[in-house]
Amino acid sequence: MSNESIKAEQDLIQEGVESEVSTEEASLIDELTQANFRIEELEQLLADALAKVEEQKDSVIRAAAEVDNIRRRAAMDVEKANKFALEKFANELLPVLDNMERALQGTNPQDETTKAIYEGVELTQKSLLTAVAKFGVKPIDPQGQAFNPDQHQAIGMQPSAEFPANTVMLVMQKGYELNSRLLRPAMVMVSQGGPSQEINIEA
């Protein structure tokens, strides 16, 4: 075998090996490119999944806050309903209390013929006031106090030397409140103060 034929044979082997290596390299590059695309896809899917988790976490926090608000409102509504459930019933009792007050005012406790009736009505009135006070009903009797339009209803005004201006001088009908909430204002006569005095100035 001549040197030339050996060299030609070696060149052929070298070309085959190079061709095989370049095919393997191309195949590896192709696989790496596909792997990189797949990694990018997976990273994007992971980022999307994490974003969804954050979104769901935010939704859960909002839902929990909403549930707390609903619970709080429901508890307040129940408390308010319990506190003021007696309002209608208490309003129905007010005329009874007024009639007892009138009966006491119209009866002379010193008169022997009506003394027993007076004492009976007085005891009944005290018992009823004690019973309704247990449920938060309290009378408003502003005699001698400053006029308060939030709790008093002025029937009229009169001059008075005894009471300063804008003072309740007479309670026509007591007012009542239920758990510090006004059931009925007290009907009152309000003082205008003392009669106005004319001042004579002689020059």
UniProtKB/Swiss-Prot annotation:
This is Protein GrpE. It comes from Shewanella sp. (strain MR-4). Participates actively in the response to hyperosmotic and heat shock by preventing the aggregation of stress-denatured proteins, in association with DnaK and GrpE. It is the nucleotide exchange factor for DnaK and may function as a thermosensor. Unfolded proteins bind initially to DnaJ; upon interaction with the DnaJ-bound protein, DnaK hydrolyzes its bound ATP, resulting in the formation of a stable complex. GrpE releases ADP from DnaK; ATP binding to DnaK triggers the release of the substrate protein, thus completing the reaction cycle. One of its GO terms (biological process) is protein folding. It is found in: Cytoplasm. Keywords: Chaperone, Cytoplasm, Stress response. Gene3D superfamilies: 3.90.20.20, Head domain of nucleotide exchange factor GrpE (2.30.22.10). Residues 1-20 are annotated as: Disordered. GO terms for molecular function: adenyl-nucleotide exchange factor activity; protein homodimerization activity; protein-folding chaperone binding; unfolded protein binding. NCBIfam families: PRK14139.1 (NF010737), PRK14140.1 (NF010738), PRK14150.1 (NF010748). Belongs to the GrpE family. Homodimer. GO terms for cellular component: cytosol. The keyword Transport does not apply. Residues 1-10 have a biased composition (Basic and acidic residues). It comes from the Bacteria.
